[in-house]
Amino acid sequence: MPTMNRSRRLALLCLGAPLLLAACASVAPSRGFDAGEGSASRHYTGRFSANYVRYGRDEGVQGSFRWEEQGRNVRLDLLSPLGQTLAVVTATPSGATLDLPNKPPRNAPEVDSLLEEALGFALPVAGMRDWLHGRPAPGRPAKSTRDTEGRLATLAQDGWSVRYVAWQEVPSASQAPAPRPRRIDLEREGGPTPLAVKLVIDPEEAP
């Protein structure tokens, strides 16, 4: 029995070694935003999980995220459950950059395909700019439903099905509390492989 336990531990270490090595490696600082001065900024933190198919096998990953936006510019940090950086995404209207540990930055017009190629799953960063605020992205076709309180309940846009599972009230120093998404479930429609992502957003503090 001790031999079996040692074998199982060794197998788990071997399976997890690439992720741990990548997480412990350094990531180059992200490119600066190209927003003009005075652009409003917001910050979100929370947890994510993704279930996807890669090389014909079911895979899953979870961790935490940090989201910073300034105008239409976004920086997204994906962290392992131990807090090490897995990837840093910087997206601006002029393009996107993906930084991975110990690898040169990768640039593209949009980052979703870069993420999927590098990590096995994509996050719809362009849509999340608005979906995290509980609204459809402007200027693009969308179908939506609302709950009895007028909040967004479901949304179909950019090839993704978005479901608002829970909301939270965000305190304000000068106004009534505003509703903000607490949990969002996303599922890609018609992609090359199944992909489902869950986001749980930490409560915001009063300004």
UniProtKB/Swiss-Prot annotation:
Keywords: Cell outer membrane, Chaperone, Lipoprotein, Membrane, Palmitate, Protein transport, Signal, Transport. It is found in: Cell outer membrane. It comes from the Bacteria. A lipid is attached at C24 (S-diacylglycerol cysteine). It holds the Pfam family LolB. One of its GO terms (cellular component) is cell outer membrane. Residues 171-207 are annotated as: Disordered. One of its GO terms (biological process) is protein transport. It is a lipid-anchor. Residues 1-23 form the signal peptide. A lipid is attached at C24 (N-palmitoyl cysteine). Belongs to the LolB family. NCBIfam families: lolB. Monomer. Plays a critical role in the incorporation of lipoproteins in the outer membrane after they are released by the LolA protein. This is Outer-membrane lipoprotein LolB. It comes from Cupriavidus pinatubonensis (strain JMP 134 / LMG 1197) (Cupriavidus necator (strain JMP 134)).
